[in-house]
Amino acid sequence: MESQQLSQHSHISHGSACASVTSKEVHTNQDPLDVSASKIQEYDKASTKANSQQTTTPASSAVPENPHHASPQPASVPPPQNGPYPQQCMMTQNQANPSGWSFYGHPSMIPYTPYQMSPMYFPPGPQSQFPQYPSSVGTPLSTPSPESGNTFTDSSSADSDMTSTKKYVRPPPMLTSPNDFPNWVKTYIKFLQNSNLGGIIPTVNGKPVRQITDDELTFLYNTFQIFAPSQFLPTWVKDILSVDYTDIMKILSKSIEKMQSDTQEANDIVTLANLQYNGSTPADAFETKVTNIIDRLNNNGIHINNKVACQLIMRGLSGEYKFLRYTRHRHLNMTVAELFLDIHAIYEEQQGSRNSKPNYRRNPSDEKNDSRSYTNTTKPKVIARNPQKTNNSKSKTARAHNVSTSNNSPSTDNDSISKSTTEPIQLNNKHDLHLRPGTY
């Protein structure tokens, strides 16, 4: 009797143990021995069906085959459905689309862990693991930025953001047109500077301040891919990416060169429109300056023809060069070289006239010596006139004496005197002057 109860009890316990292994409906807090007899048959059927689908090993002669015994082989695990990564490591839909990622439009385009050096990836609170951007993310490029100023900050100011872990950095807007790329890349460079990456941005000479790391290059590539879709990139950017799709540094370097070129073009146009020349500088230097500006503008695609160039040059002429505006203003076929020939001619004439003039100041003593020497040269003329006056004075005295004594003298003497007054007086001097008495 006891043997029958033990065998029955062992049979029940063995079936319940199998049920606890094969069935998923058994709760962990339930006693595996507390099973009703009506469920034992269901457990046996389930275990039999599972054993029929698996390959069983041949039973040993020492151990009898038990139809209720489950196979010890491990259950097969299905292969991952999304590439080489295991399924339990894949990001769930809720994790991939937290609040704030909807502004990107395509969150699945970020297959990497965000760059951890940037303060934008250190939002307050331990629960935030993804970048949290304000509601302005994804706005058009024409939307004004809340950040003050449009100029770029230097790398030193950008490095100061390393200590601030609560500062949020506004990302660049989405690029929506190839024509907007020059303006978009300025905001992207501003974004990199605010993200503590100002040192990797190429400088004026085309070289960054420091070497970029692999993590920074990954961050650069992914952010560029997110905010600048390939269909909106200019042709020259696509050409660079076709050679190396990760060479974002070359794109930034070329963009900075184009910015500098645009600034130089504007400066050249302003300089050419405000030319001034009056001969104070050599004509060769003035010609070199003007021709270099015109050649640089022509090479950059801004064509300046001879007519426009001559008008701009002549408008800035002053002084002795001003008359060229009136002598040449109707000459439609005049070239810049012909205009500079006239400018050189006037400049050489000015230099020749300046060299012919004395370049020293006369002393007052020299002027006195010159006046004395001039008086000495005229002195013989003064001396020559003195004897004439003395002779004339003597003749007047003689005539007065003759007139006073004419009453006592005979008439013949009076006739001779009257006759002598009508005849010219001969003066013996070296100038041989003939004077009439009536003139004095």
Swiss-Prot record:
One of its GO terms (molecular function) is RNA binding. Residues 429-440 have a biased composition (Basic and acidic residues). The modification Phosphoserine is found at S416. Keywords: Cytoplasm, Phosphoprotein, RNA-binding, Transposable element. Residues 1-16, 153-165, 402-418 have a biased composition (Low complexity). It comes from the Eukaryota. The record marks H401, N402 as: Cleavage. Residues 299-401 are annotated as: RNA-binding. Residues 1-93, 126-173, 352-440 are annotated as: Disordered. Induction: Ty1-GR2 is a weakly expressed element. Induced under amino acid starvation conditions by GCN4. One of its GO terms (cellular component) is cytoplasm. Transmembrane segments: none annotated. Disulfide bonds: none annotated. Residues 48-60, 127-152, 419-428 have a biased composition (Polar residues). The keyword RNA-binding applies. It is found in: Cytoplasm. GO terms for biological process: viral translational frameshifting. It holds the Pfam family TYA. Homotrimer. Capsid protein (CA) is the structural component of the virus-like particle (VLP), forming the shell that encapsulates the retrotransposons dimeric RNA genome. The particles are assembled from trimer-clustered units and there are holes in the capsid shells that allow for the diffusion of macromolecules. CA also has nucleocapsid-like chaperone activity, promoting primer tRNA(i)-Met annealing to the multipartite primer-binding site (PBS), dimerization of Ty1 RNA and initiation of reverse transcription. Retrotransposons are mobile genetic entities that are able to replicate via an RNA intermediate and a reverse transcription step. In contrast to retroviruses, retrotransposons are non-infectious, lack an envelope and remain intracellular. Ty1 retrotransposons belong to the copia elements (pseudoviridae). The C-terminal RNA-binding region of CA is sufficient for all its nucleocapsid-like chaperone activities. This is Transposon Ty1-GR2 Gag polyprotein. It comes from Saccharomyces cerevisiae (strain ATCC 204508 / S288c) (Baker's yeast). The gene is TY1A-GR2.
